[in-house]
Amino acid sequence: MDKYAVIGNPVEHSLSPVIFQAFEKQTNHSFDYLKIKAPVNGFAAAVKKFHDEGGKGANITLPFKEEAYQLADKRCQEANEAHAASALQFREDGTIYAVNYDGLGLVQDLTRNHNITLTQKSILIVGAGGATRGILGPLLNAAPEKIVIVNRTPSKAHALAKIFHLRGEIQGGGFDELEPMRYDVIIHATSLGHQGKFPPLPDGLVGSQSCCYDLSYGKIASPFLQWAKDQGAKYNFDGLGMLVEHNAAVFYLWFGIYPDTNPVIEMLQAHL
């Protein structure tokens, strides 16, 4: 039986096995899907071992996305822009193909599942790390009016804006540089939720029709989404749908079939 996996450290929390099991039942495909906890300094060896044992593909989670990108022989455009891979495909000719579908998953969740329009909208992204870099390309493809990146270290936000400046109206800065305006979409992309915190955002950013979205899901997303509700945001979503949509795109890469994501999202929401 073909083998697939999610590789990360930690990996115990990953919902990907549950999601792929649901896709497996839905599409009548049979395969094994494993959780592989790779040593922090042993990712390449773990990938080689899995590949040598007949592995066909792997989802990649923290902290190995950049290393997975470097390991690949060929990469999709989104992976090249992000300098990170969210999944690998082990091809018949022995080469490794890297993709990054994080941004695709986000845009699919926002536009298809939640009916949020991104075209000609103002988007604020909070955080300038790898998560933000991974979503910028697909967000810019949606032709927003502008994207503003805000970060505790302004230079990181400026650097990201510079990388993508040819793709559309994009700027970066620190929290004290934020213009007093109401954004259509605010995306939280920092890891502060793991500590039960959220960034020092000023009042006045959220309008009556604003959508606030946390890339994390469950309890980790709670601090930011509670802030959004307190600020009066009309729409508040966590990143569970993004994860499912990401994995649906990976499933299509591996099997050539695009699964129905709605029942899987509903199933996970009922159990989380």
UniProtKB/Swiss-Prot annotation:
Pfam families: Shikimate_DH (PF01488), Shikimate_dh_N (PF08501). NADP(+) binds at residues 127-131, 151-156, 215, 239. Shikimate binds at residues 14-16, 61, 102, 217. One of its GO terms (cellular component) is cytosol. It catalyses: shikimate + NADP(+) = 3-dehydroshikimate + NADPH + H(+). Pathway: Metabolic intermediate biosynthesis; chorismate biosynthesis; chorismate from D-erythrose 4-phosphate and phosphoenolpyruvate: step 4/7. InterPro entries: Aminoacid_DH-like_N_sf, NAD(P)-bd_dom_sf, Shikimate_DH, Shikimate_DH-bd_N, Shikimate_DH_fam, Shikm_DH/Glu-tRNA_Rdtase. It is an enzyme of class 1 (oxidoreductase). The keyword Oxidoreductase applies. GO terms for biological process: amino acid biosynthetic process; aromatic amino acid family biosynthetic process; chorismate biosynthetic process; shikimate metabolic process. The keyword DNA damage does not apply. Keywords: Amino-acid biosynthesis, Aromatic amino acid biosynthesis, NADP, Oxidoreductase. Its EC number is 1.1.1.25. Involved in the biosynthesis of the chorismate, which leads to the biosynthesis of aromatic amino acids. Catalyzes the reversible NADPH linked reduction of 3-dehydroshikimate (DHSA) to yield shikimate (SA). HAMAP family: Shikimate_DH_AroE. Homodimer. NCBIfam families: aroE (TIGR00507), PRK00258.1-2 (NF001310). Belongs to the shikimate dehydrogenase family. This is Shikimate dehydrogenase (NADP(+)). The gene is aroE.
